[in-house]
Amino acid sequence: MWFPQIIAGMAAGGAASAMTPGKVLFTNALGLGCSRSRGLFLEMFGTAVLCFTVLMTAVEKRETNFMAALPIGISLFMAHMALTGYTGTGVNPARSLGAAVAARYFPHYHWIYWISPLLGAFLAWSVWQLLQILDYTTYVNAEKAAGQKKED
């Protein structure tokens, strides 16, 4: 799955570069005052929030799964709002690579945009697994039942 996504990211970067006049301005770069370690952790937590949202809304079996795109889109939007000024918001290595290839600009810290999403996905998966082990659905269902009793 990685290879086609990387090819698509480079194709999208090339297409965006071809459609916009002048220099490519959509590459990921650390903002002024943002160190590599801060960038690493910001990207990691942004990716973790996105991945955790996907796990809780699309992977978990519920009646509301048909609406999973809404919270996923909102979490991606919030990640961009929070991180763009600091890191350019990579969140996806293929997107970061595509923009870097189109701009022919690979900063010495480009590795952040590859390592952070992997760490963030692992963090989100770990929290999700912990919730599975703790059987959080028991508490959610008990709270739903208590809420329905109040209404009756």
Curated annotation (Swiss-Prot):
Places the protein is found: Membrane
Regions of this protein lying in the Cytoplasmic compartment: 1-5, 60-65, 132-152
Superkingdom in the source lineage: Eukaryota
GO cellular component: plasma membrane
Gene3D superfamilies: Glycerol uptake facilitator protein (1.20.1080.10)
Keyword field: Membrane, Transmembrane, Transmembrane helix
Disulfide bridge partners, by residue number: none
Keyword check for 4Fe-4S: no
Family, as annotated: Belongs to the MIP/aquaporin (TC 1.A.8) family.
Protein name: Putative uncharacterized protein SCY_3531
Provenance organism: Saccharomyces cerevisiae (strain YJM789)
Top-level taxonomy: Eukaryota, Fungi, Dikarya, Ascomycota, Saccharomycotina
